[in-house]
Amino acid sequence: LYQIRSPLLETVQTSVMVWDLTDDVPVYQFRERLHMRPASTMKCVTAIATLDKLGADYDFKTNLYYTGVIDDSTQVLRGDLYCVGGMDPMLSSSDLIEMARAVRDLGIKTIEGSVYADLSFKDRDRLGEGWCWDDKNPTLSPLLVDGKDEFTYRFSRKLEDMGVTLNGSTGERQLPTDAQLLTTRTHSIRQVLHRMMKVSDNLYAESMFYQLAANGGTRWAGAKTARQYETALFSRIG
C-alpha cells in the first residue's frame, strides 16, 4: 500500500484490483478501469480454457510410425519412419533415445527409406502473435526437441547411436493412412502447466494454446480456432 501511494505513480501507469472470490466483492481498487496490456496474465485464460475443454488427464503426445515391410531375416525396414508432432514442449533428447530404442527393439538394423517429420498439427506460423521480434523465443514448431527445431537431424543421430543405419534422407511429409504406430512419448498437461504458470514460459503457453486449436483432430490448426474456444468459455461463465 505504501508503494501504491508513492509519488512515482503520478508519472507511471498502474492499475490494481484485488477481488475476494469467496464473497465476490472487490477488496481494493486503484485505477481499475485503466486499459493495460494483460501480458502473461493471459496464460491464466489459456490454462483455464484448456483444462475446461481437454480435462486434467490430457496428455501431450508425440507418435512415431513406420510404413513398409520389415524383413526379419535381414532386419531391414523397407519403408519410412514418420514422427507426428503434437507440439509437446517437453519433448527432449531422452525421448528421442527411447524412440530410437523402440525402432531397434522392433528388430530393425537398417532403414531403406527416410525419416519424415509430420508438422500438420498446427499452422505455419512460427512466432506467437504480438511477440517482439527481438525476444529470444523459440520457433513454434509442433516437433521441437529441447526447444529447438532440429528433430529429424537429432533423431537420425540417435538411430545411429542405437546401431540403426539410415540409408535414406530426412524431411517433412504428412503421415500416410497405411502407417503403423511404433511408439508414443507423452507428457501430462499437469507437467506442462506447472512450468507454464510457474516460470511463465511462452513456448509452453503457445503449446497449450494450440492443443485447443487442434482438439478433435483438426490438421493445420490455427490460433483463431483456439481463441474461439476461449471466447465461448468466458461467454458461458460470464
Question: Whereabouts are the PLM-identified features?
Answer:
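Extracytoplasmic
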Residues: 11-13, 31-33, 39-42, 57-59, ...
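Short, well-structured active-site flanking segments
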Residues: 52-67, 163-171
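Solvent-exposed loop/turn segments at secondary-structure junctions
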Residues: 22-23, 34-37, 70-71, 87-91, ...
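Active-site SXXK
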Residues: 24, 38-56, 115, 154-159, ...
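A small/polar active-site loop signature that marks catalytic segments
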Residues: 148-238
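Active-site-adjacent, His/Asp/Glu-enriched structural segments that form or flank metal-binding
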Residues: 59-124, 131-138, 144-146
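Hydrophobic alpha-helix position signal
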Residues: 1-4, 51, 103, 159, ...
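Beta-lactamase-like hydrolase cores
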Residues: 1-22, 26-35, 98-107
